[in-house]
């Protein structure tokens, strides 16, 4: 499908088949936290650092997307819930593939909390959006997170494998999910999923070196890169953090080499 191939090349590096995506969609769920207040400034930093794409809600495109400088892919997030709602794990569709196309999006994303009480409704929406994406040639990223009463550990390799595979089975072109904690078990997740898998950053990680090690381990295991938000946009220097991560993902840098970029070296 030529439309999907063209658009995917705007968010995935064609030379490495990997990507560095920076999600900036957190404002709906947790409000205007540090790092996403000045959207244009943050996007400028992550673009200069080498991010392949940013991900945001429809209303923020006019506030932050590029009109200058280095080009960067645009992913529109179709799902939302607030932290104040009765069930924050229930993600609803708040816009459409057609609207994303009108905004100039290179891809769309849908969030599914696998194992939550409202999982069936979210799966229906994912499958429906996947079919519409096929009709329009629009790449679809499925954010597949294991969350629910039956799930004791959201990073358990077995539940992450199931979540990733479910997203691919329902038509996603790229899966975003949790890292399992070590390369061996994450390699099984990648093997079990026929489309590229990128890891989420999750809550703010304690040390930058720990984050970079996780990125390195995930690509070593066959991961297709990262979709990391808070650990990039709340870094002391989002540009340097993006550059360090991109160096690992695309250039094969070691963690030690990436730390030098993070600290402002070359």
Curated annotation (Swiss-Prot):
One biological process term in Gene Ontology: aromatic amino acid family biosynthetic process
- E.C. numbers: 2.2.1.10
Listed binding positions for 1-deoxy-D-threo-hexo-2,5-diulose 6-phosphate are 25-29, 145-147, 201-202, 229-230
Q: What does this protein do?
A: Catalyzes a transaldol reaction between 6-deoxy-5-ketofructose 1-phosphate (DKFP) and L-aspartate semialdehyde (ASA) with an elimination of hydroxypyruvaldehyde phosphate to yield 2-amino-3,7-dideoxy-D-threo-hept-6-ulosonate (ADH). Plays a key role in an alternative pathway of the biosynthesis of 3-dehydroquinate (DHQ), which is involved in the canonical pathway for the biosynthesis of aromatic amino acids.
Q: Can you name this protein? A: 2-amino-3,7-dideoxy-D-threo-hept-6-ulosonate synthase
Q: Please list the GO terms describing molecular function.
A: fructose-bisphosphate aldolase activity; hydro-lyase activity; transketolase or transaldolase activity
Keywords of this entry: Amino-acid biosynthesis, Aromatic amino acid biosynthesis, Schiff base, Transferase
Active-site residues are 25, 145, 176
| Keyword Amino-acid biosynthesis found | yes
Q: Which family does it belong to?
A: Belongs to the DeoC/FbaB aldolase family. ADHS subfamily.
User: Gene for this protein?
Assistant: aroA'
Q: What class of enzyme is it?
A: transferase
The organism of origin for this protein: Methanothermobacter thermautotrophicus (strain ATCC 29096 / DSM 1053 / JCM 10044 / NBRC 100330 / Delta H) (Methanobacterium thermoautotrophicum)
What InterPro entries does the database record attribute to this sequence? Answer: ADH_synthase (IPR010210), Aldolase_TIM (IPR013785), DeoC/FbaB/LacD_aldolase (IPR002915), DeoC/FbaB_aldolase (IPR050456), FbaB-like (IPR041720)
What SUPFAM superfamilies does the record point to? Aldolase (SSF51569)
Q: Which SMART domains match?
A: DeoC (SM01133)
Q: Which HAMAP family match?
A: ADH_synthase
- What is the annotated quaternary arrangement, including any partners? Homodecamer.
Q: Specify one Pfam family.
A: DeoC
Catalyses: 1-deoxy-D-threo-hexo-2,5-diulose 6-phosphate + L-aspartate 4-semialdehyde = 2,3-dioxopropyl phosphate + 2-amino-2,3,7-trideoxy-D-lyxo-hept-6-ulosonate
